[in-house]
Amino acid sequence: MKAQELRTKTVEELNAELVNLLGEQFKLRMQAATGQLQQTHQLKQVRRSIAQVKTVLTEKAGA
């Protein structure tokens, strides 16, 4: 999701998205640890998405 799309969401929606992404990251890490993860680029994408959501949440908290 693009940062501009994230900025249009409410804080509650962003927090829900963050929880969802953290759960997905956990699942991917477990798959990587057990050797089941085929598409390792997904870890990087999820980590980047988490950072984007946290950045927008910080922006909204300061505004």
UniProtKB/Swiss-Prot annotation:
Keyword Lipid biosynthesis among record annotations: no
Pfam families in the record: Ribosomal_L29 (PF00831)
Gene Ontology CC: one annotated term: cytosolic large ribosomal subunit
Molecular function per GO: structural constituent of ribosome
Disulfide bonds: none
Keyword field: Ribonucleoprotein, Ribosomal protein
Superkingdom of the organism of origin: Bacteria
Gene Ontology biological process terms in this record: translation
Gene3D superfamilies reported for this sequence: 1.10.287.310
Family of this protein: Belongs to the universal ribosomal protein uL29 family.
NCBIfam families the record matches: L29
Protein name per UniProt: Large ribosomal subunit protein uL29
Originating gene: rpmC
